[in-house]
Regions:
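A short SAM/SAH-binding and catalytic strip from SAM-dependent methyltransferases
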Residues: 98-110
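A short glycine-rich, Lys/Arg-flanked "PGG" loop and its adjoining helix->strand segment in the class I
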Residues: 112-127
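Conserved Class I S-adenosyl-L-methionine
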Residues: 175-237
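Single conserved hydrophobic/aromatic residue that forms the stacking wall/gate
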Residues: 1-7, 11
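A short acidic, Gly/Pro-enriched loop at the edge of an enzyme's catalytic core
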Residues: 87-98
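Short, glycine-/aromatic-enriched active-site segment of Class I SAM-dependent methyltransferases
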Residues: 133-153
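Class I SAM-dependent methyltransferase SAM/SAH-binding core
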Residues: 32-34, 38-88
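Conserved alpha-helix/loop element of class I SAM-dependent methyltransferases that forms part
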Residues: 12-27
């Protein structure tokens, strides 16, 4: 199925998404994907788990494209997409069974407000599922990165800090999975393909610009060195 576009990008990998989805009973759940991008995971959840999924993103262009892709694969009745701010979610308290985030928090400076809002709109007994790139070491990070050209617009933090915020807002950790090796293997595969042909304009280059290769080199280097890590997991409210 066409869950994502040619930009089924470096981090929003369907394999990890499905692994995360299988960690709880998602059948028929109402789901909010915060920072949904082009909506790939939204369509996967709607199609395979019969979820009613709302995707929210700050980018109007991403929202427009996500709507078009969902209509193209006839999932527009199960998905909806709105432009909005992750630190001021336009929803009532206790609205969703599941909140889903994938590689979003790195661009959000106010982590406390971000996780406070996630807790607010999540129903009691609901689940927060995440897949994030996090700081692990204490060294400097080289830029550009896939999510930020400079350090001024990058707001990485550590897993312990994330856990502190979520615990503060009433969520209990159920599981945490290290996906770093998986990410390294995927990036190595990307570089192997780059040697074989020039990447198409509608692929990663379209999302990351002319510095795509350097961004991938930097993130791969930091994952290998242990400065950064990839983690997925589940919290319950």
């Amino acid at each position: 199925p066409l869950y994502s576009s040619a930009a089924s990008d470096v981090y929003k990998r369907q394999t990890v998404s499905k692994e995360l989805a299988e960690s709880i009973n998602l059948q028929g759940a109402t789901v909010l994907d915060v920072g949904c991008g082009l909506g790939g995971p939204c369509r996967m959840l709607a199609d395979e788990y019969n979820c009613q999924v709302t995707g929210l993103d700050l980018s109007n262009e991403y929202i427009r494209t996500a709507k078009e892709l969902s209509k193209l694969v006839k999932l527009d009745s199960k998905t909806s997409f709105i432009q909005g701010d992750a630190t001021s979610l336009p929803f009532d308290d206790n609205t969703f069974d599941v909140i889903w985030t994938q590689h979003v928090q790195m661009n959000i400076p106010n982590k406390e407000k971000f996780y406070s809002e996630i807790s607010r709109v999540l129903k009691s007994g609901g689940h927060f599922l995440y897949y994030e790139i996090l700081k692990k070491g204490d060294g400097e990070v080289n830029y550009p990165m896939p999510w930020a050209s400079t350090s001024e617009i990058s707001f990485l933090f550590k897993e312990t800090e994330m856990d502190n915020f979520l615990t503060k807002f009433g969520l209990i950790k159920k599981q945490s999975n290290d996906q770093t090796t998986y990410g390294i293997d995927f990036l190595n595969a990307v570089f192997a393909k780059m040697k074989e042909f020039v990447p198409p304009k509608i692929g990663l280059n379209a999302l990351m610009g002319e510095t795509t290769k350097q961004k991938l080199v930097n993130v791969l280097g930091h994952l290998k060195s242990g400065e950064l890590e990839l983690k997925s997991g589940v919290y319950k409210k």
